[in-house]
């Protein structure tokens, strides 16, 4: 769910997920279209593509369990879809952390209409 995703992003990056990534670039947040603006935005693009592969669970509402051991996210689910959902969220959180050095505040509240046609996954 959005709750676990936000918690993972906070744990990995130390940033407030809604404020820092809620409207970042063309892909972070609700909508997604156009060319990713930078590496951080590309993380969100890949994350949206990961969600598109999920079948049988709701990425916004369905809760899953994970643990934070030695600063590492460990997904712990028996349900295959929820496990995959957790892995999608884990991957974006790690990607965002790995690209903190290129995070650009000018894309924090990027206007989505400036993002042109969709990039296919």
Swiss-Prot record:
Keyword Oxidoreductase attributed: no
GO terms under cellular component: extracellular region
A biological process from GO: phospholipid metabolic process
Annotated segments matching region Important for membrane-damaging activities in eukaryotes and bacteria: 105-117
Subcellular location field: Secreted
One Pfam family from the record: Phospholip_A2_1
PROSITE patterns: PA2_ASP, PA2_HIS
InterPro entries: PLipase_A2, PLipase_A2_Asp_AS, PLipase_A2_dom, PLipase_A2_dom_sf, PLipase_A2_His_AS
Tissues of expression: Expressed by the venom gland.
Domain of life: Eukaryota
Keywords noted in UniProt: Disulfide bond, Myotoxin, Secreted, Toxin
S-S pairs: 26-115, 28-44, 43-95, 49-121, 50-88, 57-81, 75-86
Keyword Secreted: yes
Protein task: Snake venom phospholipase A2 homolog that lacks enzymatic activity. Is myotoxic and displays edema-inducing activities in mouse paw. Also displays cytotoxic activity against myotubes. A model of myotoxic mechanism has been proposed: an apo Lys49-PLA2 is activated by the entrance of a hydrophobic molecule (e.g. fatty acid) at the hydrophobic channel of the protein leading to a reorientation of a monomer.
Subunit organization: Homodimer; non-covalently linked (probable alternative/compact dimer conformation in solution).
Protein name (record): Basic phospholipase A2 homolog 2
Organism: Bothrops brazili
């Amino acid at each position: 769910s959005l709750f676990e995703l936000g918690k993972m992003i906070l744990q990995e990056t130390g940033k407030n997920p809604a404020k820092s990534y809620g409207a970042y670039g063309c892909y972070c947040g609700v909508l997604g279209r156009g060319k990713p603006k930078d590496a951080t935005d590309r993380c969100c693009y890949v994350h949206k593509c990961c969600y598109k592969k999920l079948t049988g669970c709701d990425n916004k509402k369905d809760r899953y369990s994970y643990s934070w051991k030695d600063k590492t996210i460990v997904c712990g689910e028996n349900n295959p879809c929820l496990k995959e959902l957790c892995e999608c969220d884990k991957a974006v959180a790690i990607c965002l952390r790995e690209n903190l050095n290129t995070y650009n505040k000018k894309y924090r509240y990027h206007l989505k209409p400036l993002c042109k046609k969709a990039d296919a996954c």
